[in-house]
Amino acid sequence: TDYVDLLLLRAGAGNTSSAWRVLQRLYREGLAAAIGICDHLGEFGTENLAKIAQGSEVKPAVYQTRSRSYLRSFATHGKVTDHDVQVQLLYEPGEELKEPALAQISEKYGKTRSQIILRWLVQHGVCAVVNSASKERLLENIDIFGFELAREDAAQVEKLWRS
């Protein structure tokens, strides 16, 4: 193929405005099917994303961030989707897996704690990206589509990020 599926501008990498103009040109020339912002350190923020989304000919299709910065401020999700930008989250399991409430929900559904988190993300419109070197873990990660979290269980999971 002679194009990339998704080309991301790494936030904090120099002059964002001029770099974004270059990405728009590459998109218009058909060299990138989609363009977006990669904000792994959480330093770009939704305010800057809003400026680009509102002031550009080509809006970002994706806002990619890491789980720690995103999940600690879940309100970001609404701000991003207000601009029709897909959130892509690099999910890295952490301390939340030790939470007793998550263990109870996990047991209720017969799923792992990570599967409960991933299912919650998907139910909230987030494109979750996970990493694994093991076949078993990869299969576990994709086994999240055969169930849906009940509203009260989803609310319990959301509380993990608020604390």
Residue ranges and their predicted role:
Residues 5, 9-163:
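Beta/alpha (TIM)-barrel catalytic core signal, keyed to glycine-rich beta->alpha loops juxtaposed to Asp/Glu
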Residues 1-3:
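An active-site-proximal structural segment forming one wall of the substrate-binding cleft
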